[in-house]
Design a protein with these regions (language model features):
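Residues in well-ordered beta-strands of folded domains
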Residues: 28, 186, 235-238, 374, ...
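Inter-lobe coupling/hinge segments of SF2-like helicase ATPases
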Residues: 11-38, 49
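Short, charged/polar, Gly/Pro-enriched secondary-structure boundary elements
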Residues: 11-13, 242-246, 421-422
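Short, flexible, solvent-exposed loop/turn segments with mixed acidic/basic and small polar residues
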Residues: 16, 173-176, 371-373
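Nucleic-acid endo/exonuclease domains
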Residues: 206-210, 214, 259-260, 264-284, ...
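Extended, highly charged accessory segments
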Residues: 1-7, 37-338
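Intrinsic-disorder/low-complexity loop/linker signature
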Residues: 15-17, 31, 148, 291, ...
């Protein structure tokens, strides 16, 4: 049972009776996170005026747990209620510029989705409290600012006077952060679709990605944004350490998302998929299993990872089927000026001239340091910035070898890196 949070000294202020919390602002259109007030969302450019911040958030990196001798009534109640978890994201920046590849998905002349992909995007999970808490406008939990132990809610004993030498608990909203390769699929007209449609399409695409690229279940996960009760976008991210290296293909390959949608329709127990796609008519799809699967089953769309959405998933939804047909027929159109990291093309040519294979499409990260060039089959990675000792140590424990590249490719590829690819 988790007993306390390990609070580093820098988060304590003054005499230790307060914590250095932050207010974060979340875009109500796409779910992007901003630390501080901004005029427009950095991801979708929507106005941020009037957005109510989530106050007093505190990043929690480490906790302490103790063995539980028995399950208490409070434990059972917390499990029964569940926690109100919200997922948000922010795109990485370099020299003040967003490091994002942008594209549109078009079916004919109609744009359906706006896509954004980034390596090492910051994915954050905010724990707002119990789902069935008494006051839904109050977020977070009480914590002892000195010891880090979780404390009782103030409203449980409102009339008890606290002695002056006792530190009062403070309320915080815990937030955990990680960096993952992420793809945002933003519906251009989300109000035109039922929540069941967006939920079904989300899990159909995730299953299609897993099958198309031969991934294990759970390697690619997705979240509806900005919230489960306000589905306007889908955030897909590579959940495994180092990433699977496939989400970037959905942006760079014009027909990759179409292949995924086609595979998803086949997984959903439909025949005559090619005929329906050619005609652009979902009514031509024929149910293969004669009623064995009604709205969804564990052979098609249902899984352990999407249990909260099981009531929404409906493979028989005409709207969901038509959207998947449109996705199978359309193609990706990269936005003007959208490209890979500055300098990557030059290094790709340098690697080729040195006789070593091209790096994977997605980067890897160690200790929050992005390694822009990665060769996963060789467990080798490189970057143009200075390597931290923490990154080297973590990479070494995982069996990776890291290299620092010169600032420009004109200086050539280091001999030590070239030797890693010699038989």
């Amino acid at each position: 049972r988790v007993m306390k949070a390990k609070l580093p000294p820098e988060v304590r202020t003054g005499d230790g009776s307060e914590l250095a919390t932050k207010d974060i602002f979340i875009c109500s259109n796409c779910g992007a996170c901003h630390e501080g007030e901004v005029e427009r969302c950095h991801a979708c450019n929507s106005p941020m005026a009037g957005e109510v911040p989530v106050q007093r958030t505190l990043r929690i990196d480490n906790v302490e747990a103790a063995p539980a001798d028995r399950i208490t009534a409070n434990d059972e109640e917390r499990v029964r209620q569940g926690f109100d978890i919200q997922t948000v994201f922010s795109w990485p920046r370099k020299d003040g510029r967003l490091q994002v590849t942008e594209a549109d998905f078009r079916c004919g002349e109609t744009s359906i989705l706006a896509l954004q992909y980034a390596n090492s995007a910051e994915i954050s999970r905010i724990n707002k409290g119990l789902k069935r808490r008494k006051n839904q406008t109050v977020f977070g939990f009480n914590i002892d600012p000195r010891s880090g132990y979780w404390a009782k809610s103030e409203d449980e004993e409102p009339d008890v006077d606290v002695p002056p030498d006792v530190v009062r608990p403070v309320r915080i909203v815990p937030i955990v952060r990680d960096r993952k390769n992420a793809l945002l699929l933003r519906f251009l007209d989300p109000d035109a679709y039922a929540p069941e449609t967006i939920a079904t399409v989300q899990h159909a695409l995730l299953r299609g990605i897993a099958v198309t690229y031969q991934l294990e279940e759970g390697e690619i996960l997705g979240e509806p944004l900005p919230a489960r009760d306000n589905r306007r976008s889908i955030l897909a991210y590579e959940a495994t350490e180092g990433g699977a290296g496939v989400l970037n293909r959905l942006v760079e390959d014009a027909h990759a998302l179409g292949k995924v949608a086609r595979e998803a329709l086949s997984l959903m127990h439909f025949d005559k998929v090619d005929d329906a796609i050619a005609a652009g008519d979902a009514s031509l799809l024929v149910d293969r299993d004669s009623g064995a699967c009604v709205r969804g089953c564990y052979r098609c769309l249902l899984s352990y990872f999407n249990q909260p959405d099981h009531e929404l998933i409906d493979r028989a939804s005409a709207e969901a089927k038509q959207m998947l047909i449109d996705l199978a027929r359309g193609e990706i159109v990269l936005a003007a000026g959208s490209s890979r990291h500055a300098g990557v093309d030059g290094w790709d040519a340098a690697f080729k001239d040195a006789g070593i294979p091209a790096p994977d499409g997605a980067s890897v990260s160690f200790a929050d340091q992005e390694m822009r060039f990665a060769w996963r089959t060789h467990f080798v990675a490189a970057c143009t910035s200075a390597l931290s000792e923490a990154a080297r140590e973590i990479a070494d424990t995982k069996g990776w070898t890291l290299f620092e590249l010169p600032e420009t490719c004109a200086d050539g590829v280091p001999d030590a890196l070239i030797s890693m690819f010699k038989d």
